[in-house]
C-alpha cells in the first residue's frame, strides 16, 4: 500500500509542466514577493530580529495546525481545538498554582501541570474519536459539541477570570529558558514535533494509513486496516498536540487564560489549508503545515509592521483563505 | 431490532411513521409538560412571549442553514451576515434620515434593501465559489465569515449605530400584533414559504436531488449550479432578514452580535435530523428543534443555572441527539 502511493506520486512527477511547478511553488513565491514588497515600505521586515520574531511566533501555530492536519487528512476537522486549548490552559494553571500554594517542589508542579494538561487533551481526543470513528457521527457535529463542552468547562472552573501566578519554573522550562543559545525553547519544541510527525506520517503504518483512510475509506477498510482504531487515534493525536501547544502558550502568558484559544480554531484550519492540506482528505504533510503557518504569521507580521488595522487584517485573511482554496482546487484538478 | 420482528404489521407501520418524525416532538412535549409542572414561572405569558421572540430569530436563521445543508453544503458565514446586515441597514437609515428626515417609509425601505443587499453579496460569493469553482463550502464560508465580520467592524469601529427611525424600532422591532411580537409572524411566514418551496415546487425537489446525489441530478438535466447558487443566496438573505429583525428590536446597528449564532443554527438543523451529507431535512422539524433549544435555554435560565454550565449542557445535547439519530437509523437499515 505504501508502495502504491509512492508509485502514483512518481508517475505524476513525470508529467509535470511549467504551470504545475508554478502552482506548487505559488506559496513560497508569494511569501518572497510579499516580504520584498513590504521591505520597500518598511525595511525592518527583513531584519534579523524580525525574522527570529516571526519564527518564534510560528512555533505555536505550527503545533495547532499540525494537530488539525492529523484529522483533516482523514476528511475530518476539529472545531473544538480552540476551546480545548482554553480549558487546558485554565485547568493546568489551577493545578499548578494550587500545588505551589501548598508548597510542593518544582518538579511536582511541572509534572502535575503536564499530566493534567495532556490528560485533559487525551480525554477530549478520546471523546471526539469515539463518536467519530465508532459511532460514525459527522466530525463537525461531534467537535461542535466538544467545543461547547470545553468552552463551558474553561469558563466555569476559572470563574471566567485568568488564573495568575503560574510558577516561574514552568515558564522557564517551556518559554524563556535557554538550552541552546540563539534558539528559543518554543522553536526547538516545534522543530522536534515537526520531525517526529514527519517520521510518524511517512514511515509508520499508522501514518500511511491515515492517508489511505482519507483518500478512500472503503479501500482502507477492505485492505484490512484497523480503520476505526486509527481514526480514533488521529483525533487523540490531534488533541494531544493541541494540549501540548496549550501548555506552551500558558508558559508564555504565565497565566491560565479562559479565552486563550479564541481564534485558534480558525487560524489552525486556515494555516493547514493554505499550506495545501486538502479538506477532501488524504493530501498534506508536515511541510505543507509549516509553509501555511509561516505564510499566515508573515502576513500578520507584515501588516502589523505596516500598521494595518485589525479589522482590515481580518478581511484580508478571509480573502487569503478563499484564494488558497482556489489554488488547492487547481492543483487537485491538474494532478 | 429483534423485538420489532415479533410485532404485528400495524404497530410496525406505526413505528415507521413515528420514526419518520423522529423523537423530537415527543421529547419536546415531555420537556414542556415537565417544565410546566415543575418550574412555576415557565407558563407565564411574559416567559412564553420571550421564548417565542428569541426563537423567531433562530428559526429564520436555521431555515436558511437547512437549505444549504440539504444541498450538501455548509454556511459558517451566517453568524457574520447577521451583524453585517444590522450595521449596513442602520448606517443607510441614518444616512437617509440626514438627507430626507421626513420620508420615514423611504428611509426604512432603503435600509432594509441595503441590509438584504449585503446578505445577497455574501451569498453570491459563497454560492458562486461552491457551484462554479467547486471548492469546499466549509473553507469558502470560513473565508466569508472572516471578511463579513471585518467589514462590519470596519464600517462601525465596533461602536453601535444609533439613530434609526422610531417607527422602525417601535413599530416593527418592538411592536406587537395580536399580542405577539412581529418577529414571530415574520418567522411563521418564512417557515410557511420554505415549507411550500420544499413540498410543492420544482426547486424544492431539485434541492433534495442535488444533495442526495449531485452527479445523478446533473445527468438528469437539473441545472445544479444555478440551484446551488440559489441555495446559498437564500441562506444569506434569511440571515440578513434575521439581522434586520434583531436590529429593529435592539434599536441600533451592532457589529458584534452573539458569536454563537452560526453554531446554534447548525445545532438546530442537526437536532432536527438534517443530514450533513445532504439530501435530507424538513423545515417543520427545524422549527421544532429551534424551539427545543430555546425552551431548554429558557428553562435553565429560570432554574438559575450558570450560563457557562448551560454551554456544556448544550454541547452534550447536540452530540447525544445526533448519536441517537444515527443509532436509530442503523437499526432501521438493519430492519
Give residue spans per PLM region.
Chain B
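Cytosolic-side transmembrane-helix boundaries in multi-pass membrane proteins
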Residues: 1-31, 219, 223-226, 296-335
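Transmembrane alpha-helical segments in multi-pass inner-membrane proteins
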Residues: 239, 249-315
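Transmembrane helix-bundle core of multi-pass membrane transporters
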Residues: 16, 133, 138-200, 227-230, ...
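Helix-loop-helix hairpins and the membrane-proximal interhelical loops
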Residues: 14-56, 244, 248-253
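Hydrophobic core segments of alpha-helical transmembrane domains in multi-pass membrane transport
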Residues: 24-37, 65, 90, 115-119, ...
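Alpha-helical transmembrane segments within multi-pass membrane transporters and channels
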Residues: 98-145, 288-292
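Helix-loop-helix "hairpin" substructures at the membrane interface of multi-pass membrane proteins
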Residues: 107-115, 121-126, 179-254, 265
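Single transmembrane alpha-helix segments in multi-pass membrane proteins
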Residues: 33-38, 43-97, 101, 128-135, ...
Amino acid at each position: 500500500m505504501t508502495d502504491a502511493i509512492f508509485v502514483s506520486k512518481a508517475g505524476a512527477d513525470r508529467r509535470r509542466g511549467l504551470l504545475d511547478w508554478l502552482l506548487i511553488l505559488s506559496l513560497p513565491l508569494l511569501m518572497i514577493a510579499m516580504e520584498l514588497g513590504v521591505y520597500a515600505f518598511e525595511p525592518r521586515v527583513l531584519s534579523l530580529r524580525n525574522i527570529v520574531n516571526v519564527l518564534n511566533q510560528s512555533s505555536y501555530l505550527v503545533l495547532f495546525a499540525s494537530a488539525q492536519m492529523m484529522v483533516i487528512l482523514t476528511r475530518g476537522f476539529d472545531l473544538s481545538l480552540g476551546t480545548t486549548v482554553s480549558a487546558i490552559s485554565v485547568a493546568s494553571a489551577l493545578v499548578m498554582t494550587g500545588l505551589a500554594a501548598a508548597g510542593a517542589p518544582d518538579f511536582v508542579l511541572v509534572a502535575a501541570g503536564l499530566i493534567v494538561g495532556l490528560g485533559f487533551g487525551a480525554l477530549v481526543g478520546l471523546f471526539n474519536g469515539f463518536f467519530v470513528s465508532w459511532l460514525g457521527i459527522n466530525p463537525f457535529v461531534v467537535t461542535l459539541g466538544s467545543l461547547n463542552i470545553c468552552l463551558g468547562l474553561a469558563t466555569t472552573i476559572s470563574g471566567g477570570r485568568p488564573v495568575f501566578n503560574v510558577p516561574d519554573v514552568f515558564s522557564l522550562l517551556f518559554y524563556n529558558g535557554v538550552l541552546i543559545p540563539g534558539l528559543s525553547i518554543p522553536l526547538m519544541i516545534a522543530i522536534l514535533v515537526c520531525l517526529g510527525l514527519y517520521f510518524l506520517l511517512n514511515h509508520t503504518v499508522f501514518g500511511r494509513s491515515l492517508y489511505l483512510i482519507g483518500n478512500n475509506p472503503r479501500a482502507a477498510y477492505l485492505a484490512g486496516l484497523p480503520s476505526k482504531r486509527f481514526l480514533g487515534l488521529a483525533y487523540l493525536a490531534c488533541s494531544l498536540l493541541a494540549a501540548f501547544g496549550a501548555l506552551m502558550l500558558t508558559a508564555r502568558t504565565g497565566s491560565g487564560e479562559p479565552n486563550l484559544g479564541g481564534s485558534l480554531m480558525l487560524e489552525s484550519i486556515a494555516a493547514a489549508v493554505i499550506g495545501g492540506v486538502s479538506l477532501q482528505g488524504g493530501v498534506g504533510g508536515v511541510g505543507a503545515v509549516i509553509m501555511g503557518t509561516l505564510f499566515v504569521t508573515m502576513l500578520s507580521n507584515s501588516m502589523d509592521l505596516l500598521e494595518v488595522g485589525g479589522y482590515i487584517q481580518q478581511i484580508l485573511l478571509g480573502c487569503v483563505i478563499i484564494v488558497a482554496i482556489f489554488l488547492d482546487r487547481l492543483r487537485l484538478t491538474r494532478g | 431490532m429483534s423485538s420489532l420482528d415479533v410485532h404485528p404489521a400495524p404497530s410496525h407501520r406505526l413505528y415507521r411513521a413515528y420514526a419518520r418524525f423522529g423523537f423530537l416532538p415527543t421529547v419536546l412535549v415531555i420537556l414542556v409538560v415537565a417544565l410546566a409542572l415543575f418550574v412555576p414561572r415557565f407558563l407565564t405569558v411574559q416567559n412564553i412571549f420571550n421564548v417565542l421572540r428569541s426563537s423567531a430569530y433562530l428559526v429564520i436563521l436555521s431555515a436558511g442553514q437547512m437549505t444549504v445543508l440539504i444541498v450538501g453544503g455548509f454556511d459558517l458565514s451566517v453568524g457574520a451576515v447577521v451583524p453585517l446586515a444590522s450595521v449596513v441597514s442602520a448606517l443607510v437609515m441614518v444616512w437617509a434620515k440626514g438627507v430626507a428626515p421626513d420620508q420615514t417609509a423611504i428611509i426604512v425601505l432603503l435600509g432594509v434593501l441595503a441590509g438584504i443587499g449585503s446578505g445577497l453579496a455574501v451569498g453570491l460569493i459563497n454560492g458562486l465559489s461552491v457551484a462554479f469553482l467547486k471548492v469546499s463550502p466549509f473553507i469558502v464560508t470560513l473565508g466569508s465569515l472572516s471578511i463579513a465580520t471585518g467589514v462590519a467592524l470596519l464600517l462601525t469601529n465596533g461602536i453601535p449605530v444609533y439613530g434609526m427611525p422610531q417607527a422602525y424600532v417601535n413599530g416593527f422591532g418592538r411592536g406587537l400584533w395580536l399580542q405577539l411580537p412581529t418577529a414571530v409572524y415574520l418567522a411563521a411566514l418564512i417557515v410557511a414559504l420554505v415549507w411550500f418551496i420544499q413540498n410543492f415546487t420544482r426547486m424544492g425537489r431539485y434541492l433534495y436531488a442535488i444533495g442526495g446525489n449531485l452527479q445523478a441530478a446533473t445527468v438528469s438535466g437539473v441545472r445544479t449550479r444555478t440551484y446551488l447558487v440559489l441555495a446559498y443566496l437564500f441562506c444569506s438573505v434569511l440571515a440578513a432578514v434575521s439581522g434586520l429583525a434583531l436590529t429593529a428590536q435592539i434599536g441600533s446597528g451592532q457589529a458584534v452580535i452573539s458569536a454563537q449564532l452560526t453554531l446554534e443554527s447548525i445545532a438546530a438543523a442537526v437536532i432536527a435530523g438534517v443530514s450533513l451529507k445532504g439530501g435530507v431535512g424538513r423545515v417543520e422539524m427545524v422549527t421544532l428543534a429551534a424551539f427545543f433549544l430555546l425552551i431548554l435555554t429558557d428553562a435553565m435560565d429560570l432554574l438559575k443555572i450558570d450560563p457557562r454550565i448551560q454551554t456544556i449542557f448544550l454541547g452534550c445535547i447536540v452530540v447525544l441527539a445526533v448519536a441517537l439519530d444515527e443509532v436509530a437509523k442503523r437499526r432501521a437499515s438493519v430492519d
